[in-house]
Amino acid sequence: MSDTPPHSSTSPVPHARRGSGALSHTLAPLAPADLPHLWLLHSDPRTFTLDTIGPLETVDQMQRVLGMWLDSHERDGFGYCAIREAGSGEFLGVAGLSAMPLGKRWVANTYVRLAPRAWGTGVATAALTTCLREVAALDTAPREAAFITALANHPARRLAERLGFTLSSESDPTESGAHVVYLLDLHDHT
């Protein structure tokens, strides 16, 4: 699935792929064992500062979300990846794409959430670039990607633009109405 070579068999992250961000990292599909790290990330209020929603309140919520993410990955052949620092294996965050309806069509929706330690390191750009290329190479994936973020989340909006997404006039698919939708033709990433 990756156009980058996997780590050696001694990698602490099975099926890992090297990233190219300023902070050297690996990507690997999420697994049930990632639950403790995902819970710490998604319960940290700092990682939700610019979102219209707040952090998760219970580990059970994170377990249900992780179950949905794993099911989606199994069903669609693509999904979210754990991002770990190369060498140390420290969990830095999660990034990837998942299929979702947008209007009357299906798109590959972009997701990224990083631990504060990884902010501003280039990891989000590098991880999502890799994920976009991998999804674009799949015959069964949607041909369009979406990046939906809070209107006031300027760092995420800049990230979308760095990745080549274009601000669209698409209606906010969330209940809050406080989001913008960026779109990207995945044919451009093959």
Region spans (language model):
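Acyl-donor (CoA/ACP) binding surface of acyl/acetyltransferases
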Residues: 1-50, 80, 84-190
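Conserved GNAT-fold acetyl-CoA-binding loop/helix
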Residues: 46-68, 79
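Short, P/G- and charge-enriched loop/turn segments at secondary-structure junctions
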Residues: 68-70, 169-170
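Short loop/turn motifs at secondary-structure junctions and domain boundaries
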Residues: 71-76
